[in-house]
């Protein structure tokens, strides 16, 4: 432990999802756990504040790091740049730096055939994926440049 001590990572989609068997089913939470084990402070984002709070509680308890949960939903019909700017502002206000941006979150209509996909479902996938990555990279760039940080898409 300690490779990332003093570093800050933003992880989109970092909430804690629980499967029916009680295990954790979120890729973002798995990523958050790996970074927490190495001592990084985390900013985790997602649509469900309760999942983010659950992740915060567990990660802080298990790994002695700081976690900032920020509810953020990048989708069609919202001011996405403002939502992302809010996440980045809170990260800087809380930790003073951003060393890693992990663009993990993306909503999709899993299990729906192409023939049955709606335009709304397609737009959700585009906004929560492609556009979110663009907005986060653009907003984080000045801070990542300063810390010689990294982006993981």
Region locations from a protein language model:
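Active-site loop of short-chain dehydrogenase/reductase
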Residues: 7, 64-66, 97-98, 144-153
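Rossmann-fold cofactor-recognition segment
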Residues: 61-79
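Conserved NAD(P)H cofactor-binding loop of Rossmann-fold oxidoreductase domains
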Residues: 104-110
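Canonical Rossmann dinucleotide-binding motif of NAD(H)/NADP(H)-dependent dehydrogenases/reductases
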Residues: 2-41
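A short, exposed helix-loop element centered on a Lys and neighboring polar residues
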Residues: 137-138
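Conserved Rossmann-fold cofactor-binding substructure of NAD(P)-dependent oxidoreductases
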Residues: 76-93
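Substrate-binding pocket helix/loop in short-chain dehydrogenase/reductase
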Residues: 112-114, 118-123
